[in-house]
Amino acid sequence: MGRLFQLQEYCLRAMGHKDDMDSTDSTALSLKHISSLIFVISAQYPLISYVAYNRNDMEKVTACLSVVFTNMLTVIKISTFLANRKDFWEMIHRFRKMHEQSASHIPRYREGLDYVAEANKLASFLGRAYCVSCGLTGLYFMLGPIVKIGVCRWHGTTCDKELPMPMKFPFNDLESPGYEVCFLYTVLVTVVVVAYASAVDGLFISFAINLRAHFQTLQRQIENWEFPSSEPDTQIRLKSIVEYHVLLLSLSRKLRSIYTPTVMGQFVITSLQVGVIIYQLVTNMDSVMDLLLYASFFGSIMLQLFIYCYGGEIIKAESLQVDTAVRLSNWHLASPKTRTSLSLIILQSQKEVLIRAGFFVASLANFVGICRTALSLITLIKSIE
């Protein structure tokens, strides 16, 4: 298996970032760091210009708004990473160190080797799958105009040129060389969007899966704790478990803190995107190409939301299971002093570790709620038509 978070690290390095935790200016942002942010923000102008230019055509407006919202969400993700760049790299190093310790003979981690190894395989697979999904969606947008031009030339007919994204520039963007320049600009924006989505979203689900594995490791340690034992051994074991639990809770809260803007943006913007994309799906039922385009786009944005909801769900569930692990252990054989310490662990683990932003909680229940809303919108729009 490759290095932990390797794909996400490659995406970040492609965007000009590097692991500079030890650098004296690790908190400073240079032009290369913010160039991607400026580049993506600049794409809002031609997108909004397109909406304004076609304001009387609801189909074109909704088609463009779905891209506008995606671009806005990418701006939030880039800003989140730039603002918390050092924290991101610290968490990457922390989990890599914990993974190395799980393969060593350190007692705290040795018992959870299977959990951590399987978690890292799953995180690596999901990261690659998500990156491929985002890449294929972007590629589909890019190839659409090229395929259309190729088909027209094959049949010896003429057709109007189209940009990959619905954009309107302040110059003639449908004739050479303006068309080629705008096409290249759109491709570069798409590459940045895909790279940051793969990195930021991929890191979140990888962090969440690793946290779940370590919570499971902690549960196993508690359940397998053999009582009674000598007082020194008991204190060493208890100290190790408490420190491990505190570390996992700290990492969970840190994850929630640095991803708060992204979770908020993900829920708000996905809710808006669902409305406009469902409208496009329903109104383009007769066009197979358009239907495939918007169906893949819809699947991509729902996958992004699912990543956060699933990650939040597994962290919440496994953090609560520590309470169950203590109750399933042979705690009744422990000394009164140890029982008191175990009761404190129970109290601490009964507090839900929620990944939330405002009143939005990243959970599968909320994801299902948005899916139900999407189905209701389909029924509503079809009934109106």
UniProtKB/Swiss-Prot annotation:
Tissues where the protein occurs: Expressed in olfactory sensory neurons in the antenna.
Organism expressing this protein natively: Drosophila melanogaster
Source organism, top-level taxon: Eukaryota
Stretches in topological domain Extracellular: 54-62, 153-186, 279-290, 379-385
SS bond partners: none
A Pfam family per the record: 7tm_6
GO cellular component: dendrite membrane; extracellular space; plasma membrane
Family: Belongs to the insect chemoreceptor superfamily. Heteromeric odorant receptor channel (TC 1.A.69) family. Or1a subfamily.
Record flagged with keyword Cell membrane: yes
Primary localization: membrane
GO terms under biological process: detection of chemical stimulus involved in sensory perception of smell; sexual reproduction; signal transduction
Protein name as annotated: Odorant receptor 82a
Oligomeric and partner information: Interacts with Orco. Complexes exist early in the endomembrane system in olfactory sensory neurons (OSNs), coupling these complexes to the conserved ciliary trafficking pathway.
Note: The atypical heteromeric and topological design of the odorant receptors appears to be an insect-specific solution for odor recognition, making the OR/Orco complex an attractive target for the development of highly selective insect repellents to disrupt olfactory-mediated host-seeking behaviors of insect disease vectors. Odor-evoked OR currents are independent of known G-protein-coupled second messenger pathways.
Protein task: Odorant receptor which mediates acceptance or avoidance behavior, depending on its substrates. The odorant receptor repertoire encodes a large collection of odor stimuli that vary widely in identity, intensity, and duration. May form a complex with Orco to form odorant-sensing units, providing sensitive and prolonged odorant signaling and calcium permeability.
Positions of transmembrane segments: 33-53, 63-83, 132-152, 187-207, 258-278, 291-311, 358-378
Coiled coil: none
Gene designation per UniProt: Or82a
Keyword Membrane found: yes
InterPro entries: 7tm6_olfct_rcpt
Topology with respect to the bilayer: Multi-pass membrane protein
One function term, GO molecular function aspect: ionotropic olfactory receptor activity
Membrane side Cytoplasmic: residue ranges: 1-32, 84-131, 208-257, 312-357
Location relative to the cell: Cell membrane
